[in-house]
Curated annotation (Swiss-Prot):
Entry protein name: Phosphoenolpyruvate carboxykinase, cytosolic [GTP]
Binding-site residues for substrate, renumbered to this chain: R87, Y235, G236, G237, S286, N403, S404, R405
Regulation: Phosphoenolpyruvate carboxykinase activity is regulated by acetylation and glucose levels. The anaplerotic conversion of phosphoenolpyruvate to oxaloacetate is improved by PCK1 acetylation on Lys-91 (K91ac), Lys-473 (K473ac) and Lys-521 (K521ac). High glucose concentrations favor PCK1 anaplerotic activity by triggering acetylation on Lys-91 (K91ac). At low glucose levels, SIRT1-mediated deacetylation of Lys-91 promotes the cataplerotic conversion of oxaloacetate to phosphoenolpyruvate. Phosphoenolpyruvate carboxykinase activity is inhibited by 3-mercaptopicolinate.
Catalytic activity annotation: oxaloacetate + GTP = phosphoenolpyruvate + GDP + CO2; L-seryl-[protein] + GTP = O-phospho-L-seryl-[protein] + GDP + H(+)
GO molecular function: carboxylic acid binding; GDP binding; GTP binding; magnesium ion binding; manganese ion binding; nucleoside diphosphate kinase activity; phosphoenolpyruvate carboxykinase (GTP) activity; phosphoenolpyruvate carboxykinase activity
Binding, Mn(2+): K244, H264, D311
Free-text remark on how the cofactor is bound: Binds 1 Mn(2+) ion per subunit.
HAMAP family membership: PEPCK_GTP
Coiled-coil ranges per UniProt: none
Biological or metabolic pathway of the protein: Carbohydrate biosynthesis; gluconeogenesis
């Protein structure tokens, strides 16, 4: 942040809750400096209490920002300005002295692995936005912990925001309030500054009573200074700064420096009928079913899946060499459309109370509605779309925004893992990569080695989704499902992953790749998915146990004939599901080669190049 005077005399904001004197010195300096800059009317230091939460909700209801959903217990609906509905990659930047610290310099064109901004350009952008940006509003001070308070893997942040929606959502998504300040003491914290960019009095009327400033939106990360600065958007991924900004972009950089991993992964526990349990982590791009897998009800008798987290994993090898993982979040910020009793019954149970919905449709009896909810409507019940218009099922436009969300406490999930808040984390024995591939990629394969597994992660591709602003059904590269979230140069990130193999005593997890989404020539899915995916997890479980249930192919190990339990499944065309076509894979390798050469260029680690050449070689001999 540009230099500020920290004399504490130049702001007249009235502290309406908490006291500046009670803050640790560095936190106080951070608050006062930014109060002076942003000029809020009031300062509210959040305590995280139930009572405070109730007041915030009542205040937002009064302002018309949220409505109560009378069908459920303490559930609320926010409708945003239609210009503020998703993460905006084009306005999300990382500021470092050298461009190459943030992204590899591509062979041609622009980097797709992050956006760099120079310190000078950022200073200009900052000074054009923040002075006076909170006039007439309250600056909320949110002390929050990513990870269970007191866990050696947890990290603390302080977010300053002028949005009560952010405060309410952060109370669900993180551990937040006075207890965090007590745990922090004089320790280090990540500085997070957020403003909707609408000082009062307003220059122009709000849409849906939703404050945002789309023309000037900017989400900036300053990893060297441990700062996140976000302006102009109230939407979750841009404003709940603990989520992608801190837990992935800043944390991945901390992880590189400190020798751990911050990843876009779910964490689940799977227990076999004998009561033996293993934990797996899985990286899929947004909207490829991370939440559904993390909360799965297995169809296999006697198997059990429990959820540790559905989106982000922080992982570190312990002294015994086990890779230990925590979920740094405290809630789920899930995509609503497609969530139903059939696709994710546990998510449906989780969101019945204490949940904030954003940009879903509302039924006239005070319920929520979205595409794929699969709920019959009672006679006479009508639907109001996310655009606040009456909606009928035959309408062209969707009733809920494709990236509409539920924000709900993780503790309410009926299958939350008993160890989900364990301070030391859970031991990860398998890592799964996957994406949405309609053609060519088999249901499951296992990497040949750690190095090959890292290459498989680097080569991930998937059909584009709604969580970003891209449109259309293109197959996009999304290495490690981290493409929008890398906090530093992807070439260096690959080197960091590869370096895990050289850790003394490290028990490296097996690495797998899955594709639930392969289709036949009529465009029908070849695999039923959802709870049936437990059959694939069962095979992985056996492989981790050392079962001889795999055969070698040019792309990796696949299940031997009859090694995948298909008992009770209807017609599944196993040959088509596992078919590996030379022609397809020659093209695939070409694509991967071109992408890595162009995008990672001089920063591509030699081991990845070697894996690519070896794969080419194996395919050419098919």
């Amino acid at each position: 942040m540009p230099p500020q005077l920290h004399n504490g005399l130049d702001f007249s904001a009235k502290v309406i809750q908490g006291s500046l004197d009670s803050l640790p010195q560095e936190v106080r300096k951070f608050v006062e400096g930014n109060a002076q800059l942003c000029q809020p009317e009031y300062i509210h230091i959040c305590d995280g209490s139930e009572e405070e939460y109730g007041r915030l909700l009542a205040h937002m209801q009064e302002e018309g920002v949220i409505r109560k959903l009378k069908k459920y217990d303490n559930c609320w609906l926010a409708l945003t300005d239609p210009r503020d509905v998703a993460r905006i990659e084009s306005k999300t930047v990382i500021i470092t002295q050298e461009q190459r610290d943030t992204v590899p310099i591509p062979k041609s064109g622009q980097s797709q692995l992050g956006r760099w901004m120079s310190e000078e350009d950022f200073e200009k952008a900052f000074n054009a936005r923040f002075p006076g940006c909170m006039k007439g509003r309250t600056m909320y001070v949110i002390p929050f912990s990513m990870g269970p308070l007191g866990s050696p893997l947890a990290k603390i942040g302080i977010e300053l925001t002028d949005s009560p929606y952010v405060v309410a959502s952060m109370r669900i998504m993180t551990r937040m309030g006075t207890s965090v300040l007590e745990a922090l003491g004089d320790g280090e914290f990540i500085k997070c500054l957020h403003s909707v960019g609408c000082p009062l009095p307003l220059k122009k009327p709000l849409v849906n009573n939703w404050a945002c400033n789309p023309e000037l939106t900017l989400i900036a990360h300053l990893p060297d200074r441990r700062e996140i600065i976000s302006f102009g958007s109230g939407y979750g991924g841009n404003s709940l700064l603990g989520k992608k900004c801190f837990a992935l972009r800043i944390a991945s950089r901390l992880a590189k420096e400190e020798g751990w991993l911050a990843e876009h992964m779910l964490i689940l526990g799977i227990t076999n009928p004998e009561g033996k349990k293993k934990y797996l982590a899985a990286a899929f791009p947004s909207a490829c079913g991370k939440t559904n897998l993390a909360m799965m009800n297995p169809t296999l008798p006697g198997w059990k899946v429990e959820c540790v987290g559905d989106d982000i994993a922080w992982m570190k090898f312990d002294a015994q060499g086990n890779l230990r993982a925590i979920n740094p979040e405290n809630g789920f910020f899930g995509v609503a459309p497609g969530t139903s009793v059939k696709t994710n019954p546990n998510a449906i149970k989780t969101i019945q109370k204490n949940t904030i919905f954003t940009n879903v449709a509302e039924t006239s009896d005070g319920g929520v509605y979205w595409e794929g909810i699969d709920e019959p409507l009672a006679p006479g019940v009508t639907i109001t779309s996310w655009k606040n218009k009456e909606w009928r099922p035959q309408d062209e436009e969707p009733c809920a925004h494709p990236n509409s969300r539920f924000c709900t406490p993780a503790s309410q999930c009926p299958i939350i893992d008993p160890a989900w808040e364990s301070p030391e984390g859970v031991p990860i024995e398998g890592i799964i990569f996957g994406g949405r591939r309609p053609a060519g990629v088999p249901l499951v394969y296992e990497a040949l080695s750690w190095q090959h597994g890292v290459f498989v992660g680097a080569a991930m591709r998937s059909e584009a989704t709604a969580a970003a602003e891209h449109k259309g059904k293109v197959i996009m590269h999304d290495p490690f499902a981290m493409r929008p979230f890398f906090g530093y140069n992807f070439g260096k990130y690959l080197a960091h992953w590869l370096s895990m193999a050289h850790r003394p005593a490290a028990k490296l997890p097996k690495i797998f790749h899955v594709n639930w989404f392969r289709k036949d020539k009529n465009g029908k899915f070849l695999w039923p998915g959802f709870g049936e995916n437990s059959r694939v997890l069962e095979w992985m479980f056996g492989r981790i146990e050392g079962e001889d249930s795999a055969k070698l192919t040019p792309i990796g190990y696949v299940p031997k004939e009859d090694a995948l339990n298909l008992k009770g499944l209807g017609d599944v065309n196993v040959e088509e599901l596992f078919g590996i076509s030379k022609e397809f894979w020659e093209k695939e390798v070409e694509e991967i080669d071109k992408y890595l050469e162009d995008q990672v260029n001089a920063d591509l680690p030699y081991e990845i190049e070697r894996e690519l050449r070896a794969l080419k070689q194996r395919i050419s001999q098919m």
